[in-house]
């Protein structure tokens, strides 16, 4: 879990995690980034006091950064360290709330697909698409809102956006990468290259995409994005369009469609992305969100 200076959000994330039966069998590793300015100092201090009081997990390890790394560098460093030690990782940031069945889904998914070299990650959030989705489905690429992966998949991660961008252009994959031109992922890579973004997630998506690897999404979200704003936010403010009804039952693996990518799912994502353009009053937040999703 990655935290910064938002005490209330950190508490909420932990409270939801503890509602998972698997929490008491789970090793919780918390990365607490250092304040990047004086304004964040008090929030970081209070958040660190709280995380040192947490109980209810099998074990708890806290890494307090001495200097501000920024979320992108902190996540890349933390995930790399954990998969090198444990071979797998479940990743949460402090502005995500999870279903009581989140850890069950993640652990079962990690076990089920460990040997599937074409699967990059297990993801807990799915957009509130209009069409009913299968119990779980595969989409090409990787994602970043409550996810899990293995060392063998994280090893394909490339943090060089220029390399990724050139590969996508050379293979003429821009349209597919952008979900039929419905979402500006290629632009995110370009922003990363020119220095106007500092992203890990767009590089994670592109790395898996170029290797023809897939992410498993639940048909109904097991993760909710908390509506937060300000300097401590890891995702920026959350437009209403992204809010979901969280799944209240476990995943039924007998109903999962996991043989190949779901074309139905891709189309549903595309339609959702296009629908965002109708949210005129949320355009500023949407642009912030695109940046915050991938400025990490």
Please place each PLM-identified region on the residue numbering.
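An acidic/histidine-cluster motif and surrounding catalytic segment
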Residues: 1-91, 96-296
């Amino acid at each position: 879990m990655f935290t910064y200076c938002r005490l209330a959000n950190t508490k909420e994330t932990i409270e939801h995690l503890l509602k998972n039966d698997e929490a008491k069998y789970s090793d919780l590793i918390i990365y607490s980034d250092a304040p990047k300015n004086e304004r964040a100092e008090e929030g970081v201090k209070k958040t660190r006091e709280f995380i040192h009081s947490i109980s209810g997990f099998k074990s708890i390890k806290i890494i307090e950064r001495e200097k501000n790394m920024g979320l992108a560098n902190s996540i890349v460093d933390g995930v790399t360290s954990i998969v090198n030690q444990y071979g797998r990782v479940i990743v949460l940031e402090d502005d995500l709330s999870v279903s009581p069945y989140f850890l069950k889904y993640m652990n079962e998914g990690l076990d089920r697909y460990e040997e599937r070299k074409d699967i990059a990650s297990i993801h807990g959030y799915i957009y509130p698409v209009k069409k009913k989705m299968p119990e779980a489905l595969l989409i090409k690429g990787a994602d970043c809102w409550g996810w899990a992966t293995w060392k063998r998949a994280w090893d394909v991660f490339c943090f060089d956006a220029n390399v990724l961008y050139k590969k996508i252009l050379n293979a003429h994959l821009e349209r597919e990468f952008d979900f039929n031109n419905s979402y500006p992922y290629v632009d995110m890579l370009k922003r990363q290259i020119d220095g106007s973004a500092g992203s890990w997630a767009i590089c994670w998506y592109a790395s898996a995409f170029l290797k023809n690897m897939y992410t498993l999404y639940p048909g109904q979200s097991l993760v909710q994005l908390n509506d937060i704003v300000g300097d401590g936010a890891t995702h920026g403010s959350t437009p209403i369009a992204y809010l979901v009804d969280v799944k209240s039952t476990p995943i039924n693996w007998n109903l999962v469609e996991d043989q190949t990518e779901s074309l139905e799912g891709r189309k549903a994502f595309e339609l959702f992305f296009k629908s965002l353009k109708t949210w005129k009053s949320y355009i500023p937040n949407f642009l912030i969100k695109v940046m915050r999703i991938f400025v990490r």
